[in-house]
C-alpha cells in the first residue's frame, strides 16, 4: 500500500494539487467502511479522504490553522510536500477531481507494473493462508447480547457474503480471553 500511496501523492504533487499527502496507514480492519472487506480476500483498498463541503456550492474555506485541533495541517512535512493553502475556494467538484485523480494514478501504476502487482497479490494470499494455519488469532467472537442486534446481523451477513465462515455458538464458550454466552458468533 505505501508503494501506491507514495506514487499517487508524488503524481498529484507533480500535477500541482496542493494539500495532497499520505499519512496514517490503516491496518485494514474497520467495521465503519464496507470497502475494508476487500482485505478479507487480500485485496487492496484505496481510500481517499478529501476536504468536505456543506453542499455543491463553491465557497471560501479556511483550512485548520496552526493552533487548531489538528496543528500544522498546513505545514510542510515529509509526508506532505505541497501543503494545502490556509484558505481555499473549494467545491464538491474539487473533491471529485482529487479522488478521481488519485484513482487514475493508482490505475496507471498498476498498468505499468501488472506482473509485480499480481505477484504481490499472490504472495499476500499465500502468506495469509500460511499464517492462518499457525498464528493466532484463529477466529473472533462477537458476543451475544449486543445492544443493537441488527448491526451484528449486518456484520455477520457481510462476512458470509464475502465467503468467510461464520458460526454461532449453541452453548457457552469458555476461552482464555473470557466466557461468551450461547448465541455468540
Regions picked out by a protein language model, each given a short descriptive name:
Residues 1-30, 34-185:
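Intrinsic-disorder/low-complexity accessory segments
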Amino acid at each position: 500500500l505505501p508503494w501506491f500511496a507514495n506514487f499517487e501523492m508524488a503524481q498529484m504533487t507533480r500535477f500541482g494539487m496542493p494539500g495532497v499527502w499520505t499519512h496514517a496507514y490503516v491496518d485494514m480492519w474497520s467495521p465503519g467502511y464496507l470497502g475494508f472487506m476487500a482485505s478479507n480476500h487480500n485485496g487492496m483498498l484505496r481510500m481517499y479522504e478529501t476536504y468536505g463541503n456543506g453542499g455543491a456550492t463553491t465557497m471560501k474555506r479556511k483550512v485548520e490553522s496552526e493552533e487548531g485541533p489538528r496543528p500544522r495541517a498546513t505545514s510542510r512535512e515529509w509526508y506532505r510536500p505541497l501543503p494545502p493553502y490556509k484558505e481555499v475556494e473549494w467545491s464538491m467538484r474539487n473533491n471529485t477531481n482529487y479522488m478521481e485523480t488519485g484513482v487514475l494514478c493508482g490505475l496507471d501504476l498498476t498498468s505499468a507494473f501488472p506482473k509485480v502487482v499480481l505477484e504481490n497479490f499472490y504472495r499476500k494470499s499465500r502468506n495469509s493462508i500460511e499464517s492462518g494455519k499457525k498464528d493466532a488469532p484463529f477466529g473472533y467472537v462477537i458476543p451475544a447480547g449486543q445492544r443493537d442486534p441488527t448491526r451484528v446481523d449486518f456484520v455477520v451477513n457481510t462476512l458470509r457474503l464475502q465467503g468467510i465462515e461464520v458460526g454461532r455458538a449453541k452453548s457457552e464458550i469458555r476461552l482464555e480471553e473470557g466466557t461468551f454466552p450461547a448465541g455468540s458468533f
